[in-house]
Amino acid sequence: MKKNTLSAILMTLFLFISCNNSGKDGNTSANSADESVKGPNLTEISKKITDSNAVLLAVKEVEALLSSIDELAKAIGKKIKNDGSLGDEANHNESLLAGAYTISTLITQKLSKLNGSEGLKEKIAAAKKCSEEFSTKLKDNHAQLGIQGVTDENAKKAILKANAAGKDKGVEELEKLSGSLESLSKAAKEMLANSVKELTSPVVAESPKKP
């Protein structure tokens, strides 16, 4: 959701809350009438909107970090030539893998700091678990990925999603992480949309209480 749209929603919330609070300071008859009208729970809706938007922003940051690993994968077996193009340089990929591992730990750190409403906590935890599993897989394959002269074959199995020759050194976990982030982003968008819908829903009058 764009920043301007979110600002408009939050301003609307502020106006709603201000109007509700001003009514409570009026006369008794006005307050009695207000109590017969059931409106949205503004405090709860405000929290859902704030939480879901924070999650969306964080997911975008993490997705950008994840994309940087995809870019690193394009450089497997490559070197910079003097004309600015990339030439072949086989089996020297240890720095690429170290970079991917550093990024994966940063992703885990960002997800660890993320809090969300009840409907998002489970998906946040799932994404964090996937990130940890990817980092662990790279670390556990230190004998092949943490040595001087990491082969193109092993590097591709670690971080190249399109590798058809194998994905057993990290790619499987990387794909799961990507999927979990998509699921988290979708859930946050749905919560935000539902909260806005709830905010703009018509006020319903309660049935008068029997004497």
From Swiss-Prot:
Where can this protein be found?
Cell outer membrane; Cell surface
Q: Check the UniProt entry and state the signal peptide residues, or none.
A: 1-18
For whether the record's keyword set contains Lipoprotein, the answer is yes
Its placement in the membrane is given as: Lipid-anchor
Q: Lipidation, kind N-palmitoyl cysteine: residue numbers? A: C19
**S-diacylglycerol cysteine: lipidated positions:** C19
SUPFAM superfamilies on file: Outer surface protein C (OspC)
Q: Does the keyword Membrane apply?
A: yes
A GO term from the CC aspect: cell surface
**Which UniProt keywords are given for this protein, alphabetically ordered?**
Cell outer membrane, Lipoprotein, Membrane, Palmitate, Signal, Virulence
Additional remark text: The causative agent of Lyme disease, the bacteria has an enzootic lifestyle. Larval ticks are infected with bacteria during feeding on infected hosts (mostly mammals) which retain the bacteria during subsequent developmental stages. It is transmitted to the next host when it is bitten by ticks. During tick feeding (which can last for several days), bacterial migrate from the tick midgut to the salivary gland where they are transmitted to the host.
The protein's assembly and partners? Homodimer. Interacts with tick I.ricinus salivary protein Iric-1, Iric-2 and Iric-3. Binds human (host) plasminogen.
The function of this protein is: Major immunodominant protein in mammalian hosts. Required for initial stages of mammalian infection. Inhibits macrophage-mediated phagocytosis of the bacteria. Binds human plasminogen; this probably confers an extracellular protease activity on the bacteria that allows it to traverse tissue. Interaction with tick I.ricinus salivary protein Salp15 protects the bacteria from antibody-mediated killing in vitro and in vivo.
> What family name appears in the similarity comment?
Belongs to the OspC lipoprotein family.
User: What is this protein's record name?
Assistant: Outer surface protein C
Lineage of producing organism:
Bacteria, Pseudomonadati, Spirochaetota, Spirochaetia, Spirochaetales
